[in-house]
A protein has these predicted regions:
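Hydrophobic alpha-helical connector segments
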Residues: 77, 91-123, 173-179, 205
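Amphipathic alpha-helical segments used for helix-helix packing
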Residues: 116-144, 188-193
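Short, basic, alpha-helical segments at the C-terminal edge of helix-turn-helix-like DNA-binding modules
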Residues: 80-86
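Short alpha-helical scaffolding segments that buttress acidic/His motifs in well-ordered protein cores
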Residues: 112, 125-129, 179-183, 212
Length: 218
């Protein structure tokens, strides 16, 4: 006698759901931060809730707490991910290579404007301006470990150019941060307008280079 397969024949009986696959922690954290970026950008830090981030990730609130202790913790981790490293310096200069304005443009100015084409750079700036004070450690760490060493490298280039006679001593050589000022102005303009228009960026870059030529050419 052949037995009937009741579960297969009965329309009211469904197949058991496969067990939910556990993702690696690093993958889950990435998903949470991706969702948090959209939630914080849409609602702002103050109005965003952990429930919103959990829902956007497809997790329970407890699932989010497995990886982050608070909304502030998520925000700090997000800023650390978004704040881009300063563009890496090219190969060291040869001992006899002159430091000219053209060299500064290729090593400092051009990489800066190229980075503005990355949407995550503008997202990071918007979050920093709106709520950066809520996660000062993230910004301080970036400033100390990435920005300050970059400025120190620029300062050495400027002083070498002055000593070689290929750059003129000016406010920029005395305060190297000023070499970035037009680019920072351009970046803030993009944040206000909501996008980095290529034509506008090209115009800003041309003005930036013209300023350096006027202030640094002997």
């Amino acid at each position: 006698m052949i037995k009937n397969d009741i579960s297969a024949a009965s329309p009211g009986v469904s197949e058991p759901c496969p067990p939910r696959r556990r993702l690696p922690a690093v993958t889950r954290v990435t998903q949470i931060l991706d969702a948090a970026l959209h939630v914080f950008s849409d609602k702002g830090f103050a109005s965003a809730r952990l429930d919103d981030i959990a829902a956007a990730t497809g997790l329970s609130k407890g699932g989010v707490y497995t990886h982050f202790s608070s909304k502030e913790d998520i925000f700090g981790a997000l800023l650390k991910r978004l704040i881009q490293p300063v563009p890496a310096a090219p190969e060291p200069l040869a001992d006899d290579e002159p430091v000219t304005v053209d060299l500064l443009v290729s090593r400092v100015v051009e990489p800066m404007y190229q980075s503005f084409g990355d949407a995550s750079v503008l997202q990071a700036v918007r979050l920093l301006l709106a709520d950066g004070s809520r996660a000062p450690q993230a910004f301080d760490q970036w400033h100390q470990t990435m920005f300050e060493p970059h400025i120190a490298d620029v300062a050495r280039l400027l002083q070498r150019g002055v000593q070689q006679g290929t750059l003129r001593s000016s406010a920029i050589t005395r305060e190297p941060r000023l070499i970035l000022s037009p680019g920072i102005h351009a970046m803030l303009d993009c944040v206000v307008r909501g996008a980095a228009a290529p034509d506008a960026m090209s115009a800003w870059e041309r003005l930036h280079v013209a300023m350096l030529r006027e202030l640094l050419t002997p």
